[in-house]
């Protein structure tokens, strides 16, 4: 709430100062005119990823929820190493070596940071699902300007 400060001089946790100046605010307001087009483009990318990856053993996808309007800014997949045949980290490196940059979101977990590591609440026994997901999730490249060829390259890295 106060940028990680407990008092005027004591920082107890990482924090962020998310204030924005007028120029960036004005730019953001101008960009809002194009947000619907960008979301629709990302939705097309998400549909193609979903269509191509839905039957791949060991790849688990989030489904769109009825009544929720997604902005498609991320496309996470979950890797079941046993079924897929390789770990998330192995796939990440394979993709990176081919010039395809996914992101290992939620990794490392904040609970493993030195600030939190010693807390009882941060232990693996207390957060089993968080630790499991942190080792399995990778977000595929997602941008409104991804070309069809780019999307097919990403898919190819996962399927081959």
What are these regions (language model features)?
Residues 1-160:
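PLP-dependent aminotransferase class I/II
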